[in-house]
Amino acid sequence: MRRRSFLLLFGLLFTILLPAQQKLSSRFRANIPLDSIRLSDPCILADKKTNIYYMTGTGGLLWKSQNLATWEGPYRVTEIDTASWMGHTPDIWAAELHEYKDKYYYFATFTNNAIRIDSVKGNVIPRRASHVLVSDTPDGPYKPMKDSIYLPAGMPTLDGTFWVDKDNKPYMVYCHEWLQNWNGTIEKIELKPDLSGSVGKGKILF
């Protein structure tokens, strides 16, 4: 009985002490060879503060490594606002991690297939947009900021990335999906200094 009580207490303590960002998925493993990880649109952040590599991509999960050869994970690191347009279980595509002004930012494409925004040439277009989450640490948790919308709601956008121009203004560079304009354009939109929202309207680059 004492042994069972001790194990129960130990388990509770372990759960309490486990940081919020360390939410292991059911597929968590350690010492995973890089070529064993199946991941689309991978992006790796080499974090100088922790001397650790952080990898994410489509699917919204995260892996860690100290040598780029073997990894541990995946971790669940996103916390979305389920009351927003994203809903409860959005698809997450092409996620990226960026360090900027002592914060960490999660740029990704979120899709809510339950919301239809347009139909062009027989193609139903769901609510899809590039969006930004923030964290104090590279392994999350990444949470929403002030603005729930960075780009027009009726415009499907994807594959957003981060860019700072020569005047130190931050931007999101993204794609206006071809399904709507039947060609696809690469555009940019200025971000607020803390990246918590967008400023003005997007501009076509090409």
PLM regions with names:
Residues M1-L24:
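Bacterial Sec-dependent N-terminal signal peptides
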